[in-house]
Amino acid sequence: MLGGDWNHTQGWFEDQWRHWTRAVCEREIPYAYTLGNHDDEAYLSRREIIELDMTNPNSLSSLYYQEFDGASNYVIPVYRSANSNEVVLNLWFFDSMDYKCYGVDGNGCVSRNVLDWFRKTHHQLTVDQKGVKRGLAFMHIPPQEFLVAWDVGS
C-alpha cells in the first residue's frame, strides 16, 4: 500500500511516482494507492493522480466508485491462493480528502456518502462472499474516533 502526500510541481509527481514505484514494478509486486490531503495542491487532480497510478501494470488502484467524494475509494478482495475463489480478506481504501470535514476547516475526513457506500458494499460482499470476511482499511487521515480512542486509552 502506497500512501499519499506526494506534493508536487509541474512534472514532479510523474517523475517521483515512477521513481517510487520502480522497486515494486521490477519485482512485479502488486500494490494499491490511497490519496493524501496534499496530493492535489499543484497541477494534477485527485482523479488524474489515480488514473496515472492505474497505468502501472502492478497497480490495483481503482476509480470504481467515482460518484462519491474523493477518488481513491475502492475495495480489493484477497483470495486464499492464486487458484482459489475463496475470499479471506477485503482491503478497503478510503479517500479522506484534504482540509475540510463536513464544512469545518482542519483535517479532511472520509465523507458520509463514502461511509454509506462502505456499509452497502460490505453488506453485499457478506452475501456474495458467503459470510463476513476480515477487513483492513487504509486512509490518509484517520477518523476522529481513532484520535478520541487514543486520547482516552480505550
Where are these regions (language model features)?
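N-terminal active-site segment of His-dependent metallophosphoesterases
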Residues: 1-15
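Active-site neighborhood of phospho(di)ester-bond hydrolases with catalytic His/Asp-centered motifs
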Residues: 1-4, 30-37, 138-139
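Extended hydrophobic secondary-structure segments that form protein cores and membrane-embedded regions
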Residues: 2, 91-94, 134-140
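Active-site micro-motifs of SAM-dependent methyltransferase domains
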Residues: 8, 39-40, 143
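Extended active-site neighborhood of metal-dependent phosphoesterases/phosphodiesterases
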Residues: 12-132, 150
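Active-site-proximal segments of metal-dependent phosphoesterases and phosphodiesterases across multiple
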Residues: 128-154
